[in-house]
UniProtKB/Swiss-Prot annotation:
Keyword field contains Heme: yes
Keywords: Electron transport, Heme, Iron, Metal-binding, Methylation, Mitochondrion, Respiratory chain, Transport
Keyword Ribosomal protein carried by entry: no
PTM-bearing positions, type N,N-dimethylproline: P2
Protein name: Cytochrome c
UniProt PTM comment: Binds 1 heme c group covalently per subunit.
Record organism: Crithidia fasciculata
InterPro entries in UniProt: Cyt_c-like_dom, Cyt_c-like_dom_sf, Cyt_c_1A/1B
Residues binding heme c: C28, H29, M91
An MF annotation (GO) of this entry: metal ion binding
Protein role: Electron carrier protein. The oxidized form of the cytochrome c heme group can accept an electron from the heme group of the cytochrome c1 subunit of cytochrome reductase. Cytochrome c then transfers this electron to the cytochrome oxidase complex, the final protein carrier in the mitochondrial electron-transport chain.
Pfam families per UniProt: Cytochrom_C
């Protein structure tokens, strides 16, 4: 499922992305090293990881079998409309329509690595 060609995202601001994450994603996801899964999987180390690979989380079949690697470009398309990108995903989030907000969240997610 490689993303279609699209305009590049604007530069992201990780601090703004952290605020957006806490306001829109932290209800379901944790983002700390070794953190427990919530309603959704822990997103620490997400960028560069294969989809469906966090131990102990019950992924949807669509997610577990997608073969997706979470690159910034893939995350951009996914975060815009998760259900369109990956039909069958368990993620109930409707998506982020503003490119700057997606860029900011992706910049934050890129900081979450050991």
């Amino acid at each position: 499922m490689p993303p279609k060609a699209r305009a590049p995202l604007p530069p992201g601001d990780a601090a703004r992305g952290e605020k957006l994450f806490k306001g829109r994603a932290a209800q379901c996801h944790t983002a700390n090293q070794g953190g427990a899964n919530g309603v959704g999987p822990n997103l620490y180390g997400l960028v560069g990881r294969h989809s469906g690979t966090i131990e102990g989380y019950a992924y949807s079949k669509a997610n577990a079998e997608s073969g997706v690697v979470w690159t910034p470009d893939v995350l951009d398309v996914y975060l815009e409309n998760p259900k369109k990108f990956m039909p069958g995903t368990k993620m109930s989030f409707a998506g982020m329509k503003k490119p700057q907000e997606r860029a900011d969240v992706i910049a934050y997610l890129e900081t979450l690595k050991g």
